[in-house]
Regions:
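Feature captures the catalytic ectodomains and active-site-proximal regions of enzymes
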Residues: 1-381
Length: 381
């Protein structure tokens, strides 16, 4: 009862990202503790607190995001590499940076005991993704060290707009190389992306060769694949019906994954290991009708177009994308971002889409789960 009241009080008086990070840590701690006991009543209490926290967090971001982008004391996607990764690099010991796409903080806390065993934790923090909380925006910003609008201006050939064909993250290695040059870091590095089991095995088998590099970057996409598959594959939807089940699925996957083998081998080889992500994800349950021109983007948690109409107040709308450091696809582009557990649907086939995407994991919007994500550094004892 006392903890409940203290948490409620802190939620109601949060007025900085750092305070929200501390609240999210507390909520996650209690959620994980309570999920281990079979008491739905208590679990529902912490869930209701998290729901209220997300409501207030959405309002906080709506009112303060422009200032957050200007605050040099806050670690964001486009400042993460310079502020957090570069200081960890050393010629004395190779560093393996593993970016697990779509890894939430609560998922990390479930994987943490196994991953940190036999190693010393030197950094165990949370940083904030920029919005939209998607791979295109967040991860390109991490590797470039630039905001999306800066990437578009400086490297227009490497930035694809919403409706351009082709992959949106095909130039991460090139963007990282350019960032290292810009920061004056003459280091040897390599970059790999694992999107299936075969590639995971291949990387594991040649990991020993990575010792010659000061920095090895590994983007591991499997958690993202689980998240996206949830809307398509019924058995995954059944396995990950809520956050508790989603964490369990993540842990089961990790314990049988090539990623676990890679981390174990990296420890044996004496690597310093950085573990982070580009954004998280949230279970969506509240449909919201949206309409726009024919070029409107497809993501369920944010939309951009020349003109957008939405029915709910659970959105953040901006008519000047540059104020959020975002490029404009058109002269009159605008963005809307879903808050809380909302997802956008069109009037065409409304009921079909509502049922298809209800209780699925989506990202791109504004929530604690999507924006506040782990950054961890471990090294040999």
């Amino acid at each position: 009862q006392k903890n409940y009241q203290e948490i409620n009080s802190k939620i109601n008086y949060c007025n900085s990202i750092k305070e929200w990070i501390e609240i999210y840590k507390i909520l996650t701690y209690w959620e994980l503790e309570i999920s281990q006991i079979d008491n739905n009543d208590i679990y529902e209490i912490i869930e209701s607190q998290k729901k209220e926290a997300n409501r207030l967090f959405g309002t906080f971001i709506e009112e303060n995001y422009k200032n957050i982008l200007l605050d040099n004391d806050i670690d964001l996607s486009h400042t993460l590499f310079k502020n957090k990764v570069i200081p960890e690099l050393s010629s004395e010991r190779p560093t393996l940076m593993i970016l697990i796409d779509n890894l939430r903080y609560d998922q990390w806390k479930c994987l943490e005991p196994d991953i940190i065993s036999d190693y010393k934790v030197t950094v165990n923090e949370i940083y904030s993704s920029i919005i939209p909380t998607t791979t295109q925006y967040s991860r390109n910003s991490i590797f470039s060290g630039l905001s999306p609008i800066e990437i578009n201006k400086k490297h227009s050939e490497l930035w694809k707009n919403e409706n351009d064909e082709g992959g949106k993250n095909l130039f991460e290695k090139l963007l990282l190389k350019e960032q290292l040059v810009r920061l004056g870091k003459n280091i040897s590095f390599n970059y790999h992306k694992v999107i299936n089991t075969k590639e995971g095995i291949k990387y594991y088998e040649k990991l020993e060769n990575e010792k010659q590099n000061d920095l090895s970057v590994l983007v591991y996409n499997f958690v993202d694949m689980i998240s996206h598959a949830k809307k398509d594959v019924n058995f995954i939807k059944e396995l990950a019906k809520d956050d508790k089940a989603y964490r369990s699925l993540t842990l089961s996957w990790y314990n049988n994954s090539n990623l676990k083998k890679i981390i174990t081998k990296a420890k044996e080889l004496g690597h310093k290991i950085i573990i982070t992500t580009d954004h998280g994800t949230i279970n969506v349950n509240t449909p919201s009708l949206v309409s726009g021109d024919k070029e409107i983007s497809t993501n369920l948690r944010y939309k951009t177009a020349k003109k957008i109409n939405s029915e709910t107040k659970k959105v953040i709308k901006i008519d000047d994308p540059s104020s959020f450091l975002l490029p404009s696809n058109y002269l009159s582009s605008c963005f809307i971002f879903a808050k809380e557990n909302t997802y956008f649907v069109y009037s065409n086939n409304y009921n079909n889409y509502v049922n298809m995407f209800k209780n699925t994991y989506q990202h791109g919007g504004v929530s604690l789960e999507e924006m506040l994500v782990p950054f961890v550094v471990i090294k040999p004892k």
